């Protein structure tokens, strides 16, 4: 998320950082220090109210929404499906599906009247993967949103596309997705995900943050003006 925001700002985008973490202020400061334009808002994107407030904030700041990047999500628990509790299944789907579902709805409310806009959903090649069935289901839903919504709004000037990242080398998260992971999942269960991700990638490695940000920014740009309704795998040859 940070890499996409900083690169977008460096190319002239007016960037609104939406996050519950206080780290959003650090990203805004870095963008401004580099000469870019950015602001932030703290809302819960797992709720309709939070998504609606975020979109309205962008409109209040700059009068319109040209690009929405839906980047909320991530596996909370890594384990075989029979070990998931019902509340954990609910939490995985709420984390990795509903922010995209709600933000798409909130964004098109502003994009449709202006007759233009691009939505880039961040999916995952893990729609076909081990030890994260609820997450896979949620990201499969993101792919379905992308295809179906694109069809509805294509003739009204809006593109809806998705990038599906594979394994990515990234620094530790500032706010862990699951602070109790060591107690709630076995190390070998998580290692299965790592091994499967590398095995499935033709390049046999994880990607970099820039290798993931580049396709997202391409899909958001006018260079992709004839692309909509598809999910582009960015996983070193793993199609998901």
Identify the role of each PLM range.
Residues 155, 167-200:
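A glycine/serine/threonine-rich, flexible loop-to-helix segment
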Residues 109, 151-155, 225:
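Alpha-helical segment proximal to the catalytic Tyr-Lys
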Residues 78, 216-217, 228-240:
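Short C-terminal tail/terminal secondary-structure segment
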Residues 104, 138, 146:
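Active-site helix of classical SDR
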Residues 75-90, 113, 131-134, 173-178, ...:
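Conserved mid-core segment of classical short-chain dehydrogenase/reductases
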Residues 1-16:
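Canonical Rossmann dinucleotide-binding motif of NAD(H)/NADP(H)-dependent dehydrogenases/reductases
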Residues 66, 82-102, 116, 120, ...:
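Catalytic Tyr-X3-Lys loop
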Residues 42-54, 86, 210-211:
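The beta1-alpha1 cofactor-binding region of Rossmann-like NAD(H)/NADP(H)-dependent oxidoreductases
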């Amino acid at each position: 998320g940070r890499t996409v925001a900083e690169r977008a700002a460096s190319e002239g985008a007016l960037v609104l950082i939406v996050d519950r973490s206080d780290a959003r202020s650090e990203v805004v400061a870095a963008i401004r220090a580099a000469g870019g334009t950015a602001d932030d808002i703290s809302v819960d994107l797992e709720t309709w109210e939070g998504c609606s407030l975020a979109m309205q904030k962008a409109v209040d700041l700059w009068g319109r929404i040209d690009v929405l990047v839906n980047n909320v999500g991530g596996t909370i628990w890594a384990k075989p499906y029979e070990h998931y509790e019902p509340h954990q299944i609910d939490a995985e789907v709420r984390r990795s599906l509903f922010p995209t579902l709600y933000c798409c709805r909130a964004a098109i409310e502003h994009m449709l009247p202006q007759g233009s806009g691009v939505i880039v959903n961040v999916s995952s090649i893990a729609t076909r993967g081990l030890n994260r069935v609820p997450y896979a289901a949620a990201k499969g839903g993101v792919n379905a949103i992308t295809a179906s919504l694109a069809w509805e709004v294509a003739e009204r000037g809006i593109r809806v596309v998705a990038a599906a990242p594979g394994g990515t080398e990234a620094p530790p998260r500032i706010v862990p997705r699951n602070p109790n992971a060591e107690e709630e999942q076995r190390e070998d269960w998580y290692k299965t995900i790592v091994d499967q991700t590398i095995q499935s990638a033709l390049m046999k490695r994880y990607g970099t943050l820039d290798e993931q940000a580049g396709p997202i920014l391409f899909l958001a740009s006018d260079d992709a003006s004839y692309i909509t309704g598809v999910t582009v795998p960015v996983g070193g040859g793993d199609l998901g």
